[in-house]
């Protein structure tokens, strides 16, 4: 099964200055995304700062998103943490809320073997009756899930998709070559959204979409339709800005940008903190430049 095609936003979680969740603003961000044709909402992932949330709060944030979206687009909920038993408990609790799928990251800090990854994901997949998106992000976890491991896991009935945040199109091609259509691939790196879709991907799980949701939707739409010139035109138009979004650790820059476009105050939970003033200025200037351009 395909959960969605196109642009899924890895949505930020807005906080008040005291660190509590700003649910009113969160609802407004969800409405902004849907109004701009975002194809799916990914909540409580890396960009949503789920690693700073206790389980009960993460569940509450996910429940709020599911209730607010009310079936208009798919909601994928982050449920992976760095040990298997905890991931199972959290996944089962989130399953009760009715998300369309779970996003499960490879264990971080606790590095294991490829066989350990297989057993970890199979144990989680066996514990729930929901589609699971594997999430491979070695820049945050310190470990790459190998294409052969993804092939093995694709045989499980509940493991239906793969978020590729390795940042190397050669890895994506290796996965595609091995796995074929057994599992859907989503880009986890906005700077190669179009190449991954042209390599057979179904779309993106995007940080960029927090700031430019319509453009990200169109970028994916054109790539899926094989309107290559239009797709690459948008990929290249936003490329410098995408790189700025990762000039400091995500989601620090993107939350600043969400503030700059007037959608949310910029508050974090430590150890996340405000970007350097020089980067804040560059982000503001680039947003102004992009907004001054004609077209999509």
Placement of each model-derived feature along the sequence:
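Catalytic alpha/beta core domains of metabolic enzymes, predominantly
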Residues: 126, 140-246
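Alpha-helical structural signal in soluble globular domains
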Residues: 60, 64-69, 93, 97, ...
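A general structural signal for well-ordered alpha-helical segments in protein cores
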Residues: 26, 58, 62, 87, ...
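Active-site beta->alpha loop and helix N-cap motifs at the rims of alpha/beta catalytic domains
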Residues: 2-9, 13-142
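C-terminal alpha-helical cap/extension of soluble enzyme domains
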Residues: 3-14, 32, 36-38, 93, ...
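Glycine-rich phosphate-binding "P-loop"
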Residues: 136, 158-159, 269-270
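Alpha-helix N-capping/helix-start residues
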Residues: 17, 23, 55, 147, ...
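Secondary-structure boundary/capping positions in well-ordered alpha/beta enzyme cores
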Residues: 72-73, 131, 160, 182, ...
């Amino acid at each position: 099964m395909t959960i969605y095609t196109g642009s899924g936003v890895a949505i930020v979680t807005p906080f008040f200055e005291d660190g509590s969740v700003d649910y009113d603003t969160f609802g407004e961000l969800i409405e902004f995304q849907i109004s701009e044709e975002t194809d799916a909402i990914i909540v409580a992932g890396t960009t949503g700062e789920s690693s700073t949330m206790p389980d009960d709060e993460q569940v509450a944030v996910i429940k709020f998103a599911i209730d607010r979206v009310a079936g208009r687009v798919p909601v994928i909920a982050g449920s992976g943490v760095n040990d298997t038993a905890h991931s199972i408990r959290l996944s089962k609790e989130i399953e009760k809320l009715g998300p369309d799928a779970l996003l499960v990251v490879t264990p971080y800090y606790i590095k294991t073997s490829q066989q350990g990854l297989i057993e970890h994901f199979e144990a989680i997949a066996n514990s729930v009756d929901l589609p699971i998106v594997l999430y491979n992000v070695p820049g945050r976890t310190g470990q790459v899930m190998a294409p052969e491991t993804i092939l093995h896991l694709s045989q499980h009935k509940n493991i239906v998709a793969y978020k590729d945040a390795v940042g190397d199109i050669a890895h994506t091609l290796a996965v595609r070559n091995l796995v074929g259509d057994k599992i859907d691939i989503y880009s986890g790196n906005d700077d190669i959204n179009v190449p991954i879709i042209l390599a057979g991907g179904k779309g993106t799980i995007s940080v960029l979409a927090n700031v430019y949701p319509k453009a990200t939707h169109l970028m994916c739409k054109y790539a899926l339709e094989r309107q290559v010139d239009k797709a690459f035109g948008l990929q290249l138009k936003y490329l410098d800005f995408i790189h700025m979004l990762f000039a400091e650790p995500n989601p620090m820059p993107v939350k600043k940008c969400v503030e700059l476009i007037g959608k949310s105050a910029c508050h974090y939970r430590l150890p996340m903190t405000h970007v350097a003033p020089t980067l804040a200025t560059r982000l503001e200037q680039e947003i102004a430049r992009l907004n001054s351009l004609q077209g999509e």
